[in-house]
Amino acid sequence: MIKKLLAGLLAIMIICSPLLIFPYESFGQTAGDTLTVRVGYWGEDGDYRVKAQLTKQQLEALPQQTNFYTNMTRVGTIMATVGRGPVLSDVINAAGIDIGSVRMIHLRTTDAGGRVNNWFLDFKADKYIGSTLYYYPNIIDNWEILGERLGKPLEGALEGRSKVDTILAIESYSTKVPSKAKEINASQMNEEDSYRLCAGQSLLTEGKETSDVSANESAKWIFGIDLTLWGS
């Protein structure tokens, strides 16, 4: 009777707690120095081949930009980031790929939670390449949180805005704490989140609500970029 009871309890544990028996791979770890760029064609789902493997030294050798970014979060607050690295389009060119041939960009990260191909984020190429995005240095003190995925720039929020390129940051620092966001500076950058996508916010209108959540697209721990090309 006792043996049957123990066997039953063990069966319940296996059914209800598979992670105890078959643990999943741990994610959210530093990605490493090498960036793997793979390419595939539209309509060939999941079929990607390695085009280039770029070392940290190769990425450092590309023209560098140090930029500041402000992005709205999913809870309607503002995240501030400072990052240094090459422009994303330069990284793609360094891999021997014509920017004009790229339809979709997929970021592979160790923070992907086990998704297919470790994709954290995928987007149309023209969203961050060739588009105009902005940094708003005065938005922290002039921003109204309206709810989840909703906020509004107040008077003065758009003053001093500047266009920023999308970069693949080798070193960066970000914060969602308003008091820290106002004091953010380049000396705070480190490589803990590398490689990280840093992109600006879309064009905002003073006094007009926006639901453009861009902070969750600031992927970190990127170890690979998959590019879906036009054609076949």
Q: How should each PLM-predicted stretch be described?
A:
Residues 1-4:
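Positively charged n-region of N-terminal signal peptides that target proteins for export
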Residues 10-18:
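Hydrophobic core
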Residues 19-23:
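Juxtamembrane cytosolic interface motif at the C-terminal end of transmembrane helices
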Residues 24-232:
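N-terminal intrinsically disordered, low-complexity segments enriched in P/E/S/T
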